Every structure is written in C-alpha cells, then in structure tokens.
From Swiss-Prot:
One Gene Ontology term from the biological process aspect of the record: regulation of carbohydrate metabolic process
GO cellular component terms listed in the entry, alphabetical order: cytosol
Quaternary structure and interacting proteins, as annotated: Homodimer; the beta-strands of each monomer intercalate to form a hydrophobic core, while the alpha-helices form wings that extend away from the core.
Keywords, ordered alphabetically: Activator, Cytoplasm, Repressor, RNA-binding, Translation regulation
Localisation per UniProt entry: Cytoplasm
Record Gene3D superfamilies: Translational regulator CsrA (2.60.40.4380)
InterPro entries for the chain: CsrA (IPR003751), CsrA_sf (IPR036107)
Identification of the protein by name: Translational regulator CsrA
Length: 61
C-alpha cells in the first residue's frame, strides 16, 4: 500500500486520467474529489460491498 500525505488542495494522480484531490479536512473526516472517466466506476467501499452481495444473491436464485 502506498501511503501519501496531502494538504487541502493537493492532488494525487492515478495513471493518466484519474485524479483525487483533498478538498477539506475537518476533525477526523477528509473530503475528497475524484475525477475519472465515465467508464470507471467509483464507489465507497461499503457501497461496493453491498453491490457485490446483491449481485451474488441474484446469481444464487
């Protein structure tokens, strides 16, 4: 795992077409902005896990 330190307004680039920018830091929460091509799905981990579980449930029917 790559661990980076960023300040508000600073950006991390992934490949040529994905950028993650730190927008705000308040207490223990960090607000980030993600720019990615429309064909790249972006989900919070807990939402992605729900999507995976729903897909597995549909495949077992």
């Amino acid at each position: 795992m790559l661990i980076l330190t960023r300040k508000v307004g600073e950006t991390v680039l992934i490949g040529d077409d994905i950028s993650i920018t730190v927008l705000n830091i308040r207490g223990n929460q960090v607000k980030i902005g993600i720019e990615a091509p429309k064909d790249v799905t972006v989900h919070r981990e807990e939402i992605y896990e729900r999507i995976k579980l729903a897909a597995e449930d549909n495949n077992h029917v």
